[in-house]
């Protein structure tokens, strides 16, 4: 029997108020995450990955940002229309988020211990400081922080960037959420620490049976961590597949461009890396039809006239491209 998804995002559109009027940062975004599954959301900076995550968490900056339409179902509960007070109880207990920059996400004037105790007080109604500190010490130990009793008394500026991110992961896991959202969790960390943080997130996800939404621009991170992935471009999802399929048989020209631009150690020839020409269009200057058509080597008149629907390539594999269907060759010109 097929398992019901933990998270279902349907037709999500979120916009921001600008001098040019309201502009959609994400438009008609749809995907699902099953219980215990790790889904990657990948794309260039500004494509709408973080806005998607903030929309799920109902943390878009107000009043500029808002969800215009769509559903965000956590089980049977639509988070998009949940009253604010009830949504606050869901954050932390049902879903939690690890943000890009822990120094700005942590409160600089409160100790690590106080911030962890606050999570226990709000979501588990634990008022006893000794009991909360015991749980906090155990949690810090689980995320690999040495001497956790001492760390409880320290402030965010007193620990390293990698340690701060471990604290953020501990805070996100404090109340055993069903869904963990990690938004570029290794930003500004050196390569060695990046690998440790990603290993920690994956280990905790598997140990606790969490569902994971991992947001990144790094396809290598996706390959190591996720089961499936969605590729975003200019506010829309252009391809969805399991990791193996997408890396071996990408169907959308943008996905192929991303994969072609990855440096390969086995390539000993002194050749230039492949690049995707042009720039991602500004939200106020989106072209008609396919949003990738100005940069696409396969673009034809139909791409400029009409926005492509999601074409089913195979079971579990879809791409928003007129030339992605199974009846076409991978590089068909129509």
Model-found features: residue ranges?
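Short catalytic/signature loops enriched in Gly
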Residues: 5, 146-150, 240-334
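ABC ATPase NBD coupling module
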Residues: 79-96, 122, 245-250, 281-287
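P-loop NTP-binding/switch modules centered on Walker-like glycine-rich loops
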Residues: 44, 181, 185, 189-271
């Amino acid at each position: 029997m097929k398992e019901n998804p933990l998270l279902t995002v349907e037709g999500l559109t979120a916009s921001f108020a600008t001098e040019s009027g309201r502009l959609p940062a994400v438009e008609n975004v749809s995907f699902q995450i099953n219980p215990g599954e790790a889904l990657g959301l990948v794309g260039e900076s500004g494509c709408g990955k973080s806005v998607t995550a903030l929309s799920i968490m109902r943390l878009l900056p107000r009043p500029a940002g808002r969800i215009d339409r769509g559903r965000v179902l956590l089980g049977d509960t639509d988070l998009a229309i949940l009253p604010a007070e009830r949504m606050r109880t869901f954050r932390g207990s049902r879903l939690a988020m690890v943000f890009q920059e822990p120094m700005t996400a942590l409160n600089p004037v409160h100790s690590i211990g106080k911030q962890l105790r606050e999570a226990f007080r709000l979501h588990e109604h634990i008022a006893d400081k000794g009991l909360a500190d015991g749980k906090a010490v155990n949690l810090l130990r689980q995320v690999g922080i040495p001497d956790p009793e001492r760390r409880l008394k320290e402030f965010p500026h007193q620990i390293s960037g990698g340690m701060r991110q471990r604290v953020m992961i501990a805070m996100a896991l404090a109340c055993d959420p069903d869904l963990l959202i990690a938004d570029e969790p290794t930003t500004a960390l050196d390569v060695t620490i990046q690998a440790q943080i990603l290993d920690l997130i994956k280990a905790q996800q598997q140990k606790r049976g969490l569902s994971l939404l991992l947001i990144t621009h790094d396809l290598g991170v996706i390959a190591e961590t996720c089961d499936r992935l969605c590729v975003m471009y200019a506010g829309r999802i252009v391809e969805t597949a399991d990791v193996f399929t997408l890396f071996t048989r990408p169907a959308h020209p943008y996905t192929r461009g991303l994969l072609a631009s990855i440096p390969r150690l086995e390539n000993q020839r002194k050749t230039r890396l492949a690049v995707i020409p042009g720039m991602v269009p500004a939200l106020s200057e989106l072209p008609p039809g396919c949003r990738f058509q100005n940069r696409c080597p396969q673009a034809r008149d139909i791409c400029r006239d009409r926005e492509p629907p999601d074409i089913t390539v195979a079971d579990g594999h879809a791409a928003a491209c007129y030339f992605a269907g199974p009846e076409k060759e991978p590089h068909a010109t129509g």
